[in-house]
């Protein structure tokens, strides 16, 4: 998934920083990713052998992490063997792909996504929304409806539900008619948005170690956690993730919310992050660090964030030994620079601030 702030390409730098301070703990200890997003960092440390705790406040993020972090064993899909006979002769590791192909072949139906996020469903509205093609919207509606029906009928487990929903979210994002975020859609369907939606199965990361996933406000959760390594990747600026990914949130929740404005925004008042507010961010960060129960704390932040270097250093060094690493990084651009919209710089500096607690 093309996600603002994703640390996928920065993983070598992040791991180098963490292992240089925490050593073998980063291969065998407990690791908490408190602002997990799509789970890229948590996935990496799960693969390294850590017991990972992942948390994200958005439901779509919770779903992704429930699968990538929370799922540790193969998914057998025993409850669907009568519904999909091919499962009876399919090896365990391949059963997820069989179920995904079944969903991919469902007849399209009209539903919430096709009626509210596609051009055909919004033709008579004040604004025609073009987040997805009509065909992909209807395919999404059919698949999402079937996944919920199986869960209600107890034909799939929660783990199987998260696998299928994660697969749908990842594949829908790959055919979205956006410039990476859902705060706006493009005026015409781009080539990738015209591709038919597929259900290419997402990877399953197996593990024998316990893994945990939460959906909480980070500052409310921190007092309940104890970990060797606490990794923090909060929002850097005023853009709320609840607004930037509202369409994925609606697909994940499948709750048919009231929508507002040109972009079809759902109400996200209860998901506003203090880390996106210049007025509240320092207080929230100080509270988080003060109550963190961890041997090592690592903070990813860049030079364009709302917190200043002084803010970060003053807060972190109260709890122990502070330091930081840095690396140049290509900044996120949702669209190309133009005469009307000029990008300040093509690169930012990414920092890893660290704290070894007393």
Residues covered by each model-derived region:
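S-adenosyl-L-methionine
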Residues: 1-34, 40-48, 62-64, 71, ...
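Class I S-adenosyl-L-methionine-dependent methyltransferase module
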Residues: 51, 58, 62-205, 238, ...
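Conserved SAM/SAH-binding loop
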Residues: 215-220
């Amino acid at each position: 998934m093309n996600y603002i702030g994703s640390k996928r390409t920065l993983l070598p730098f992040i791991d180098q920083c963490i292992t240089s301070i925490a050593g073998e703990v980063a291969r065998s200890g407990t690791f908490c990713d408190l602002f997990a997003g799509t789970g890229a960092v948590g996935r990496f440390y799960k693969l390294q052998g850590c017991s990972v705790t992942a948390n994200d406040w958005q439901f779509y993020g919770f779903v992704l992490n429930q699968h990538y972090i929370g799922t540790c064993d193969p998914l057998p899909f025993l409850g669907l063997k009568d519904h999909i006979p091919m499962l009876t002769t399919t090896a365990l590791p391949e059963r997820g792909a069989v179920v995904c192909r079944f969903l991919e072949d469902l007849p399209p139906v009209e539903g919430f996504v096709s009626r509210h996020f596609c051009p055909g469903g919004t033709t008579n509205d004040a604004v025609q929304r073009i987040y997805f093609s009509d065909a992909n919207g209807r395919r999404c509606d059919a698949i999402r409806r079937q996944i919920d029906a199986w869960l209600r009928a107890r034909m799939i487990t929660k783990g199987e539900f998260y696998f299928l929903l994660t697969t749908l979210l990842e594949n829908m994002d790959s055919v979205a008619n956006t410039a990476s975020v859902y705060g706006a859609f493009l005026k015409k369907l781009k080539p990738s948005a015209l591709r038919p939606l597929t259900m290419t199965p997402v990877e399953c990361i197996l593990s024998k170690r316990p893994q945990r996933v939460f959906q909480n406000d980070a500052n409310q959760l921190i007092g309940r956690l104890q970990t060797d390594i606490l990794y923090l990747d909060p929002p850097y600026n005023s853009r709320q993730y609840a607004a930037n990914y509202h369409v994925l949130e609606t697909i994940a929740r499948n709750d048919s919310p009231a929508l507002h404005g040109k972009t079809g925004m759902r109400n996200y008042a209860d998901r506003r992050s203090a880390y996106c507010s210049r007025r509240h961010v320092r207080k929230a960060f100080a509270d988080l660090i003060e109550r963190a129960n961890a041997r090592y704390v690592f903070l990813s932040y860049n030079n364009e964030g709302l917190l200043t270097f002084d803010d970060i250093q003053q807060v972190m060094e109260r709890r122990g030994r502070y330091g930081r690493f840095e690396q140049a990084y290509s900044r996120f651009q949702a669209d190309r620079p133009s005469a009307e919209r000029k990008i300040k710089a093509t690169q930012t500096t990414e920092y890893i601030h660290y704290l070894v607690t007393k």
